[in-house]
């Protein structure tokens, strides 16, 4: 560190506008900090401004500070740290590593015309006295402990519903999957149960296991409570040593592994407290084998394994509006560019079971607007989606029904069309038709009306200048009523207009090797329709009493001359007097 008065600005700071702005900061700080202002000369040569100084307060106190300016200054704020013991000050404003919260976290609180000197003058005393403004959010210590281990690709899964207050120690039964990767030792694990010191059961996992935790190796490891556990500080070895304890190792994939868990009361949300989980790990890698003495081992290496929460309340916490999908079964017919994104979004948002029907194969040409990529080439669409969904969204089970509606069955020994449709629609709560085939839509309308099921149909115009998402209540307008509403018997427009381009088939193409003409359109336009389908499904299942009349939502995406932002209109669809669904 060099005194500011002796500091010669290097070219990295002197020749750029951002560098000159940093130098102006030094002048302002020097006016208050005086001779205490020191500049890291080595960092400055690389264009980094790192400084230390003593800041005088109006009450006579002088506070030692360190500041580092990001490369993105002045658009983003400098980071300021205490050089004294931060435990003397309120922890909500002064982190255990000394970081000061002079402003709220949101970047909007810092403006490019502000200076650190002005900020310290206005806010430092309030921060140190605990009288400054606070962000209305919790300070969970597990987040900071997890950050020490995120580069490893490892995790342990827990459930926020477990209540362990009043207990000091015990054991956890852990399903452990260990492997050696390019980035080091990877541990993927899930706690199956939590027990007190006397063996009594305190909590048990009910969430389905993700595919990444596929091991059958269940091991018992210790847990203990430490409500005085602080944020991680100091050297990595000292820090991890606080939580990496225990004596029992298990052998996994060429290494001896020891896990230990520390539970600490923490602020999970603003002024709401609960238990934080921290996982310490020690690994002894096997480096060679001896016929007499067994494997030789490297020294133990302690580390942190991030703890993540994947219980039912944890998965749905960020989006409470999709709670209606839990416990529901939804059938999706047609898994092309409209149906595949809808199926994945329904799974992502918590649908318990999907029944998927298609009989097409994913080809390379599909990939430009299909939901999955090259790893699915050559796979039946329903099978590819089943594998993907059950691997990535383990709370959703998938029934894949291979069938193309309308094909005759010439073999009495295999299930026929009626059998396949019964399998598809068994116990479902809602049907989504993404077949883009009017005949199939009419058939599903008939079947859903007979079964008392609601149907959502989605389709796009051949040139993708528009499309529609239609809700059909079993006692309101059906797909045939929709056809009557679009066009009169004389060929004139009905009271519900077609989407733009609906009757323009001039842009249909037949790619080489494809047996059918197909529409031209991009995934980013098609997803407008797929996502509206999911929104409608969530709304219908959330408030079924409000959805007693069929409804047509028509979107236009193109005005012939150019693409435009989606423009929606909504029309009720009553039963048409000329439709047989009235009888």
Swiss-Prot record:
Gene3D superfamilies: NAD(P)-binding Rossmann-like Domain. Pfam families: ThiF. The keyword Thylakoid does not apply. Coiled coil: none annotated. It comes from the Bacteria. Keywords: Plasmid. The keyword Electron transport does not apply. PANTHER family: THIF PROTEIN, TRNA THREONYLCARBAMOYLADENOSINE DEHYDRATASE. This is Uncharacterized protein y4qC. It comes from Sinorhizobium fredii (strain NBRC 101917 / NGR234).
